[in-house]
């Protein structure tokens, strides 16, 4: 292992293309030591709440996340200690009892809508990205994801977007753009920006005597 792992924070609205950017960067370093951490695995455990109450969870509010737990895990990885990454069950609206064992790596990509909102998280990052995509495209992607991956109905997704996602984006997500070192328009389709990011990451790794 090298001296200091590199932490890359990738933020942006729901459906902005954060995951595509993350995967593109990951693929570029596939032969190296790299891992991905999704912020939405670190929603707070709600097993103590009745199921009906969990249904009202606002997943787009900063208080929905257990950032203390996430920060603890990032700090462990920075010190080359393995973690037991949580799994979140979106159908039961709480944290699963199962975990995934994750070994430390030289590059850590932290991705999520609000990874730039908490200063404690920002202070752990070497590079901060914000993926900026038009709202129309984001809602289409959100609808497709929640229906296909989370078993939601189209009516419930649209209702949630209008009443929760959009106002939370405007209040909490969009303002974090100012903390980004680089703003990437058009998400994973912006190959020029991604190539520049890869070059920057390689430079940091070389400086840290990892590559």
Swiss-Prot record:
Keyword Transferase (UniProt): yes
A Pfam family this chain is assigned to: PRK
GO molecular function: ATP binding; cytidine kinase activity; uridine kinase activity
Record field: catalytic activity: uridine + ATP = UMP + ADP + H(+); cytidine + ATP = CMP + ADP + H(+)
InterPro entries per UniProt: P-loop_NTPase, PRK/URK, Uridine_kinase, Uridine_kinase-like
Entry binding sites for ATP: 12-19
UniProt keyword list: ATP-binding, Cytoplasm, Kinase, Nucleotide-binding, Transferase
GO process annotations (BP): CTP salvage; UMP salvage
SUPFAM superfamilies associated with the record: P-loop containing nucleoside triphosphate hydrolases
EC number(s) recorded for this UniProt protein: 2.7.1.48
GO cellular component: cytoplasm
Localization: Cytoplasm
Claim: Cytoplasm is one of the keywords in the record: yes
Pathway it works in: Pyrimidine metabolism; CTP biosynthesis via salvage pathway; CTP from cytidine: step 1/3; Pyrimidine metabolism; UMP biosynthesis via salvage pathway; UMP from uridine: step 1/1
Family named by the database record: Belongs to the uridine kinase family.
Protein name per UniProt: Uridine kinase
Record organism: Bacillus subtilis (strain 168)
High-level lineage: Bacteria, Bacillati, Bacillota, Bacilli, Bacillales
């Amino acid at each position: 292992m090298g001296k200091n792992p590199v932490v890359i924070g990738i933020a942006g609205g729901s459906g902005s293309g954060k995951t595509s950017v993350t995967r593109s960067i990951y693929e570029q370093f596939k032969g190296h030591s790299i891992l991905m951490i999704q912020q939405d695995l670190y929603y707070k455990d709600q097993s103590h709440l009745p199921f009906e109450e969990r249904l009202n969870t606002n997943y787009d509010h900063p208080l929905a996340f257990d950032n203390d737990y996430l920060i603890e895990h990032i700090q462990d990885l920075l010190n080359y200690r393995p973690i037991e990454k949580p799994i979140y069950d979106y159908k039961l609206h709480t944290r699963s009892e199962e975990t995934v064992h994750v070994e430390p790596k030289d590059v850590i990509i932290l991705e999520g809508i609000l990874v730039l909102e908490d200063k404690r998280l920002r202070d752990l990052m070497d590079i901060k990205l914000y993926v900026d995509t038009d709202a129309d495209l984001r809602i289409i992607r959100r609808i497709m994801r929640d229906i296909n991956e989370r078993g939601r109905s189209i009516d419930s997704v649209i209702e949630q977007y209008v009443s929760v996602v959009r106002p939370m984006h405007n209040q909490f997500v969009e303002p974090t753009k100012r903390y980004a070192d680089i703003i990437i328009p058009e998400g994973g389709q912006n190959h020029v920006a991604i190539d520049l990011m890869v070059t920057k990451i390689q430079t940091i790794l070389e400086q840290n005597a990892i590559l």
